[in-house]
C-alpha cells in the first residue's frame, strides 16, 4: 500500500476528493472476479464456507452529520459520546436519518458538475473486531465493501486507508499493515453526494449508506489475484474448450503451478496442470505472473436459461511440491453468444428475449437485497415465463449473478452510468475530464462479472446520450471480452457503440420522429436500409399502475419478424417504501411522502408486481403473451388442436395438456394428454367431437408441469388458451306466465310493481332511484350514466399540479367537463304493454350549460319480473373520447361473494385481456379490487354474460366492477391507505370501456381500436332478482 501522509481529518476533507471526476479512488485494489481463498480444494468444489472469509455485517456504530466538515477529528480514533447503532447493510434514510428522495430525470441536487452542495449528509460508521492471529503473521488481509452510496473514506486503527466511489461495485482495500493483535477499529465516513452522483441519475430512490455486505478476506502472500473463465464451443456444439487465465502475485514463477479441475457434481470431467508464465507477447518478453491453460471437453451439457447445466471449476495454486497454497472456484456454463446473420444467438439458436428490467428494491429495506429476496424474484420471473433480466441500471449484488446462473436467466449487465438530467444528456460523455470516471464503471463491471454464464450482453449504461467515451468503452469491451455483444441505447439506440438496436418505448407500428434521435416503429427499424442488427427493446410496456394495454401486439410482432427478438418490460417491482403511521399501522409511500424535494411522485411505481412481490394483473398478461407453448384450433369437427413448443433447448418431458369444454361455464367434456415435444416441435392432437349444445360453448386448454422443478411447484401452469366453439341453434325460450306489472304514477316518482318487486323512477331526472325486493331497498343512489373513470397513470401522463399536459386524457376529460356533468331531463314517457310496462327517458348531460352526452334509456319490465334496459348514448361532436359508456349505482347490500360468467378471474380491460379466460368465476368481493398504491380505475371484468351479486342478477354483454370505493373517491385520493369503505357497494356496468394503454405512460398510448371514437353507442342489459 502506498504510504499516505498523516493528515488530519479536516486537512483530508479540504482536498474535496468527492468533487474531482479524475480521482475515483485512493489505494483501492484492482477489480477482479469474486475470490474466496479456500485452503482445501474439496471445500472449493463444494462451495463450502471459506475460513479465509469473515462477514462484518451486523450492528455498527453510527453518527450522522449534515456535512463532512462537521465531523470532529476525534471520531477517527474513537466513537463520539452520542454514537448510535445502525445495521449494516442498510440505507440510513430508512432508520430516521435524513430523507430518501425519489426523482426520475431531475438531479436531486443543483446541476453543477463536478460540484455538490456543501450541505452534504454524512454518515460515520465504526466497528471493532478481533482479527485471527494467523492472519497477522503472514499473507494479506483485505476489507471488501460490496456497495456504498455514494463515496466514502476508510480508516483502520486511526490510520487512513483509502477512498472510493461508485455505489454499485466493490471497493477493496489492503489492511495488512494496519491490523493489530486484539481489538481493531475501522471507521467509514460515507458522503451522500459526490461527483459520481452525476453519473448515478437513475430513475429510483436516492438513498445512502453501506447497503451491501462488508467482509474480510485473507489471502496468502503468494496468491491468485484474478481468474478469467471463457468457454468456446465447436461449430457443431458437440465439444468445448474451457479456457482459464490466472493472474497471481508470485515471488518466483518457476516455483509454482496452476491446476484446474472441472467437475460435474462429484464426477471429475477434466483436469490440467502447468507452470506459470505465458508465451512471448512482444519484444519485451512474456508475463511471468499469469498463465493460460485450456481443457478439452467432449459432449458437454450446454448452459441456457431453459436447462442451466453448470459445472464447477476449481483453480488451485500449487507450490513446487504440488502442495495446495490456495484455491478459487466458480460455476461454469458452457455456452456461446453471438450476433450472426442479423440475430442474437445462443448455442446457435436465435433467442426470443422474454425480459424485464429490475431494480434492487425492497419496500422495507430499500436497496438492501438478501438471498431469499433475490430467489423470490427469480422464481416469480421463471414462473411467469420470463427468461431474461436487465440489471437496470447498475451492476447488481454479486450473488444475483450466481443465482441467475443456477436457476437460468439471461442477464444484461449494465454499467452504473446514467446522466439523464444533463442538458444535453451526452455532456459528460463527451467531456474528456470525465473519461476516467466513465471508464472505471464499465471496465470494473466486466472485470468483476465476466465469469458468469448468465451474462449474455454487456451494457454501457443508460440514458447518457452518446459521446466519444461510449465509442471508446465499446471498443475496450470488444477487445477484452469478445465473447459477448455490447448494447447501448443512448444517442438513438442504434449508434456504432451497440451490436443490437435497443430502443426504449418504440411502438410496434407508429414512428416517433424526435429531433436528432428519431424513434421508429420497431417494424420499420429492422427494415431500414443497411441495418443488419437485431432489435431488442431495452425498455418497453411501461407497467405503471393499471397498465400494459396492447402488450400482445408486441408479441405478435416478435413472433412474426425474426429480427425483433423481444425486449425488457419496464419494470419488475413497484418502488414504494413502507412508512409507519402514528397509530403503528404501515402504509406505502412514494415520491414526496418524505418531504423530499424535488420529487416525481408515483412515477417510481411501474412494476409488474407490487413492492411486496404480490402480482399486478398485468403480470398474468405478460405470462400469457410470453408463454412457451402456442396453440391453434385447427378444426372443430372433430376438435383438433395444434401445439408448438417455443423451447429452444429442452424437450417437454414434464408437461401435460389438460383440456375441457365448458357450456355456460360448466364442464361437459375434458381430458389430459402427456406431451412429448422436442425443442421447437409441433404436434396435432384430436380432442374429441363437438358437443351439440346451444349457448356459450368454449374450449379451454392449459399446459401444466406435473413434477416440481427448481423454480416451480408441482402442477405449475405454464401456458393456456381458449376458443368459443360453434354452438347448436337455440330456440327462444317460451315466456313463463307471470303477474302483469302495474304502473303507479306519483307526484315525484313513477313506480312499477310486480310480484313483490317495486321499481321507482324519478320524475325530475328520469333515473331509476330505487328497486325494492320484498320491500327491501336495493339502491343507495340512482342508476346513472357514467362516462369517466378515476384516472390511470397512463391517463394523467406528465401532468402535475403546476405543469399540465394538455394531451393527457385526464386533462382533456377535465377541460370537456366530464367530471362535472349536470343532468337535464328532456323527455319521460310511460307505456303499458301487453306483457309489461315500458318507461322511456331522454337525458342530456351538460357542462357549463353545453350538452356533452345525450342518453336515451328504455326500461321494459315484463311479467317474469325482469327489467330489460336498452341504452343509447350520443356524444357531442368535437369532444374527447370518453373513458367509458356505462352506468353506475351504489348498492345497499354488501354480499360476500360475486359470481359471473365472463372473462376472469383477474382484472381485465379491452386491450389487456389476452390472459383472461371465459368461464364461470366466483370470488370474494374484496378480491375484485386491485390495490394499486396510487388509487385509480381498477377491478374491471369484461366479456361478461351473467353477473350475480347478492339479490342482483344481470345478463347481457358488458363489463362490470364492484367496489367499496366510488369513482369520485378513487379520483380524489392520493394513496391506497387513505381510501375509506363507503356505505354499500358501488356497481359499474359498462357497455363500452376504452383501453388502458401502456406503451408508455407519458403520452396517449391507447390504440385506436380501443378508443371510443364512435358518436353513438348502444348496449342492452337484463336485470332480475338474484
UniProtKB/Swiss-Prot annotation:
EC number: 3.2.1.23
GO molecular function: beta-galactosidase activity; carbohydrate binding; magnesium ion binding
Membrane-crossing segments per the record: none
Biological process annotations from GO: lactose catabolic process
Cofactor(s) needed by this chain: Mg(2+); Na(+)
Residues binding Na(+), per UniProt: 203, 603, 606
Entries under SUPFAM superfamilies matching the protein: (Trans)glycosidases, beta-Galactosidase/glucuronidase domain, Galactose mutarotase-like, Galactose-binding domain-like
Keywords associated with the record: Glycosidase, Hydrolase, Magnesium, Metal-binding, Sodium
Active-site residues per Swiss-Prot or TrEMBL entry: 463, 539
Keyword hit for RNA-binding: no
UniProt GO cellular component terms: beta-galactosidase complex
Free-text remark on how the cofactor is bound: Binds 2 magnesium ions per monomer. Binds 1 sodium ion per monomer.
Pfam families: Bgal_small_N, Glyco_hydro_2, Glyco_hydro_2_C, Glyco_hydro_2_N, LacZ_4
Binding-site residues, Mg(2+) 2: 599
Enzymatic class: hydrolase
Family classification: Belongs to the glycosyl hydrolase 2 family.
Annotated protein name in UniProt: Beta-galactosidase
Name of the coding gene: lacZ
Amino acid at each position: 500500500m502506498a504510504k499516505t501522509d498523516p493528515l488530519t481529518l479536516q486537512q483530508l476533507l479540504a482536498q474535496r476528493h468527492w468533487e474531482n471526476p479524475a480521482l475515483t479512488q485512493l489505494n483501492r485494489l484492482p477489480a477482479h472476479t469474486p475470490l474466496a481463498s479456500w485452503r482445501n480444494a474439496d471445500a472449493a468444489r463444494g462451495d463450502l464456507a471459506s475460513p479465509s472469509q469473515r462477514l462484518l455485517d451486523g450492528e455498527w456504530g453510527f453518527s450522522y452529520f449534515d456535512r463532512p466538515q462537521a465531523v470532529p477529528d476525534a471520531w477517527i480514533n474513537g466513537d463520539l459520546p452520542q454514537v448510535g447503532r445502525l445495521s449494516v447493510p442498510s440505507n440510513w434514510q430508512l432508520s430516521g436519518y435524513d430523507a430518501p428522495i425519489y426523482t426520475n430525470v431531475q438531479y436531486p441536487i443543483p446541476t453543477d458538475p463536478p460540484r455538490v452542495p456543501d450541505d452534504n449528509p454524512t454518515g460515520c460508521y465504526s466497528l471493532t473486531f478481533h482479527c485471527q492471529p494467523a492472519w497477522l503473521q503472514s499473507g494479506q488481509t483485505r476489507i471488501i465493501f460490496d456497495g456504498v452510496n455514494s463515496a466514502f473514506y476508510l480508516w483502520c486503527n486511526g490510520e487512513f486507508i483509502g477512498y472510493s466511489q461508485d455505489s454499485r461495485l466493490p471497493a477493496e482495500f489492503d489492511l495488512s499493515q494496519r491490523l493489530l493483535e486484539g481489538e481493531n477499529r475501522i471507521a467509514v465516513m460515507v458522503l451522500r453526494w459526490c461527483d459520481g452522483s452525476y453519473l448515478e441519475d437513475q430513475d429510483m430512490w436516492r438513498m445512502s449508506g453501506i447497503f451491501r455486505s462488508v467482509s474480510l478476506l485473507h489471502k496468502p502472500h503468494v496468491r491468485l489475484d484474478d481468474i478469467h473463465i471463457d468457454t468456446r464451443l465447436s461449430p457443431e456444439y458437440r465439444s468445448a474448450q474451457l479456457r482459464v487465465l490466472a493472474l497471481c502475485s508470485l515471488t518466483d514463477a518457476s516455483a509454482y503451478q496452476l491446476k484446474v479441475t472441472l467437475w460435474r457434481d462429484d464426477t471429475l470431467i477434466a483436469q490440467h496442470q502447468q507452470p506459470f508464465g505465458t508465451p512471448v507477447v512482444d519484444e519485451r518478453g512474456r508475463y511471468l505472473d499469469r498463465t493460460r491453460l485450456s481443457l478439452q471437453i467432449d459432449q458437454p451439457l450446454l448452459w441456457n436459461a431453459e436447462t442451466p447445466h453448470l459445472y464447477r471449476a476449481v483453480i488451485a495454486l500449487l507450490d513446487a511440491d504440488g502442495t495446495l497454497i490456495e484455491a478459487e472456484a466458480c460455476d461454469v456454463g458452457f455456452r456461446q453468444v453471438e450476433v450472426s446473420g442479423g440475430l442474437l444467438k445462443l448455442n446457435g439458436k436465435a433467442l426470443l428475449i422474454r425480459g424485464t428490467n429490475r431494480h434492487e428494491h425492497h419496500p422495507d429495506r430499500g436497496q438492501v437485497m438478501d438471498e431469499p429476496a433475490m430467489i423470490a424474484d427469480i422464481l416469480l420471473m421463471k414462473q411467469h415465463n420470463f427468461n431474461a433480466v436487465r440489471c437496470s441500471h447498475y451492476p447488481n449484488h454479486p450473488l444475483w449473478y450466481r443465482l441467475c446462473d443456477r436457476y437460468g436467466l439471461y442477464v444484461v449487465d449494465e454499467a452504473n452510468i446514467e446522466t439523464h438530467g444533463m442538458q444535453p444528456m451526452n455532456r459528460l460523455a463527451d467531456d474528456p475530464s470525465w473519461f476516467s470516471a466513465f471508464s472505471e464503471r464499465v471496465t470494473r463491471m466486466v472485470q468483476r462479472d465476466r465469469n458468469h454464464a448468465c451474462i449474455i450482453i454487456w451494457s454501457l449504461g443508460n440514458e447518457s446520450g452518446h459521446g466519444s467515451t461510449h465509442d471508446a468503452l465499446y471498443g475496450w469491451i470488444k477487445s477484452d471480452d469478445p465473447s459477448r455483444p455490447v448494447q447501448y441505447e443512448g444517442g438513438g439506440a442504434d449508434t456504432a457503440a451497440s451490436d443490437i438496436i435497443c430502443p426504449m418505448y418504440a411502438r410496434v407500428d407508429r414512428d416517433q420522429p424526435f429531433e436528432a434521435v428519431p424513434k421508429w416503429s420497431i417494424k420499420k427499424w429492422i427494415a431500414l436500409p443497411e441495418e443488419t442488427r437485431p432489435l431488442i427493446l431495452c425498455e418497453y410496456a411501461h407497467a405503471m399502475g393499471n397498465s400494459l394495454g396492447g402488450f400482445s401486439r408486441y408479441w405478435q410482432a416478435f413472433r412474426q419478424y425474426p429480427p425483433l427478438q423481444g425486449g425488457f418490460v419496464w419494470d419488475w417491482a413497484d418502488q414504494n417504501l413502507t412508512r409507519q403511521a402514528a397509530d403503528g399501522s404501515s402504509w406505502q409511500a412514494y415520491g414526496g411522502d418524505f418531504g423530499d424535494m424535488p420529487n416525481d411522485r408515483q412515477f417510481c411505481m411501474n412494476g409488474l408486481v407490487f413492492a411486496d412481490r404480490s402480482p399486478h394483473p398485468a403480470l398474468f398478461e405478460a405470462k400469457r403473451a410470453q408463454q412457451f407453448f402456442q396453440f391453434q384450433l385447427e378444426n372443430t369437427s372433430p376438435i383438433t388442436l395444434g401445439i408448438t413448443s417455443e423451447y429452444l433447448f429442452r424437450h417437454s418431458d414434464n408437461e401435460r395438456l389438460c383440456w375441457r369444454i365448458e357450456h355456460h361455464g360448466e364442464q361437459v367434456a375434458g381430458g389430459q394428454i402427456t406431451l412429448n415435444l422436442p425443442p421447437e416441435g409441433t404436434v396435432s392432437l384430436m380432442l374429441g367431437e363437438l358437443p351439440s349444445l346451444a349457448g356459450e360453448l368454449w374450449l379451454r386448454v392449459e399446459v401444466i408441469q406435473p413434477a416440481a422443478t427448481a423454480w416451480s411447484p408441482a402442477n405449475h401452469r405454464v401456458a393456456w388458451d381458449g376458443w368459443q366453439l360453434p354452438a347448436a341453434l337455440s330456440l327462444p325460450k317460451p315466456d313463463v306466465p307471470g303477474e302483469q306489472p302495474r304502473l303507479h304514477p306519483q307526484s315525484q316518482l313513477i313506480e312499477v310493481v310486480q310480484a313483490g318487486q317495486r321499481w321507482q323512477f324519478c320524475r325530475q331526472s328520469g333515473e331509476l332511484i330505487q328497486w325494492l325486493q320484498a320491500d327491501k331497498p336495493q339502491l343507495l343512489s340512482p342508476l346513472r350514466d357514467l362516462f369517466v373513470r378515476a384516472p390511470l397513470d397512463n391517463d394523467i401522463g406528465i401532468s402535475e399540479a403546476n405543469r399540465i399536459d394538455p394531451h393527457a386524457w385526464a386533462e382533456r376529460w377535465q377541460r370537456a367537463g366530464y367530471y362535472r356533468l349536470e343532468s337535464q331531463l328532456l323527455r319521460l314517457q310511460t307505456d303499458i304493454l301487453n306483457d309489461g310496462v315500458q318507461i322511456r327517458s331522454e337525458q342530456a348531460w351538460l357542462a357549463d350549460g353545453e350538452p356533452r352526452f345525450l342518453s336515451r334509456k328504455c326500461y321494459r319490465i315484463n311479467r317474469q319480473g325482469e327489467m330489460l334496459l336498452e341504452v343509447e348514448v350520443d356524444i357531442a361532436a368535437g369532444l374527447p373520447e370518453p373513458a367509458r359508456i356505462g352506468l353506475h349505482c351504489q348498492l345497499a347490500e354488501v354480499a360476500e361473494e360475486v359470481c359471473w360468467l365472463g372473462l376472469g378471474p383477474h382484472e381485465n380491460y379491452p386491450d389487456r385481456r389476452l390472459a383472461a379466460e371465459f368461464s364461470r368465476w366466483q370470488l370474494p368481493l374484496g378480491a375484485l379490487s386491485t390495490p394499486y398504491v396510487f388509487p385509480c380505475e381498477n377491478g374491471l371484468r369484461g366479456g361478461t354474460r351473467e353477473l350475480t351479486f347478492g339479490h342482483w342478477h344481470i345478463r347481457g354483454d358488458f363489463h362490470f366492477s364492484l367496489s367499496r370505493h366510488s369513482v369520485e373517491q378513487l379520483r380524489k385520493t392520493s394513496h391506497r391507505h387513505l381510501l375509506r369503505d363507503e356505505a354499500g357497494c358501488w356497481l359499474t356496468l359498462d357497455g363500452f370501456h376504452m383501453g388502458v394503454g401502456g406503451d408508455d405512460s407519458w403520452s396517449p398510448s391507447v390504440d385506436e381500436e380501443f378508443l371510443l371514437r364512435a358518436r353513438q353507442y348502444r348496449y342492452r342489459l337484463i336485470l332480475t332478482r338474484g
